[in-house]
Amino acid sequence: MARPASCLGAVAIVLVVLCAAMSSAAAQPRRPLPPNSRVIHPGRFGKRTQTLTCDNTKDKRNPCVATCDKRCPNECLVLCPSCKTYCLCDFYPGMSCGDPRFTGADGNNFYFHGKKDQDFCVVSDADLHINAHFIGKRNPSMSRDFTWIQALGIRFADHRLYLGAQKTSKWDNDVDRLELTFDGAPIDIVADIGSQWQSTAMPAMTVTRTSMTNGVRVELKGVFDIMIKVVPITEEDSRIHNYDVTEDDSLAHLDIGFKFYGLTDDVHGILGQTYRSNYVNKLNVSASMPVMGGIASYVSSNIFATDCKVARFGHNGGISMVTARAN
């Protein structure tokens, strides 16, 4: 049964960050930056500070050292000439910084730890299915893995879309580590901000670069709007959280923002269930960050499999519905 119109009309944004040190990106265009500001990426140099000279030199000040907040160590905004820094999420609604979490459609945050080297169904509906592949690191002092999302496998109609982060030893933000395929064929996009790829098989689907490397926006008209960015675990992240990152693997993973249109009231999955009109949050909301269990219900046999216990994909002829909405 379809969700009531009042619910369908309100497009919910789900921000996804999994069980390590991810901050999620907004699934909506960024508004213009404030005047006299610069975005810096000190994380690529393995530290949170960066020396810069602001464009406005009338005050004849010496170059200042800008320090990104620990909520956003790899990217932040510097206001000139004060050299004060802010996380981008302080300016852009819908973005999230800080502790790893899912943010459900009901507005509540929760962890889903999952397990490394396994796939889990994040959203499963009649005409849309999204799995996430987890990578991880085991800390001997803990009973679970540190986990991150390395890739998404998206099924709609008879198509398969793969969005992934390539395994990377030494991180270089100027090298593109995105891996994108549609129905098994590579998606190649010119390395310029705003460059766009459009599917010939599904013209309503576009992939647009949001940065010259490692960031894209994937849109399927009337179905979803996804922002992804490949990021590493930095030495600082590893030191603070005891991730024990080694030189042979920077644990490159995805920061993800989801925006969905027209999910039905039968939707399920780790996140999908929070969109149901009858969803009841049974997590311990008094905890600093509730943890969703029930891993067995969400395990998929591979990145594109629709065999998790709560799968809804293809039910009630829904596979053809997405094509109609996208045209």
Which stretches of residues belong to each language-model region?
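Context-dependent free N-terminus signature
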Residues: 2-3
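Cleavable N-terminal signal peptides of Sec/SRP-targeted secreted and luminal proteins
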Residues: 6-25
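Intrinsically disordered, low-complexity segments used for protein-protein interactions
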Residues: 10-16, 31, 35-38, 42-43, ...
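Low-complexity, Pro/Ser/Thr-rich intrinsically disordered segments
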Residues: 26-53, 323
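Intrinsically disordered, low-complexity eukaryotic regions enriched in glycine, serine
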Residues: 44-46, 58-59, 184-185, 191-192
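Secreted, short cysteine-rich peptides and small extracellular cysteine-rich domains stabilized by multiple disulfide
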Residues: 46-91
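Von Willebrand factor type D
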Residues: 90-327
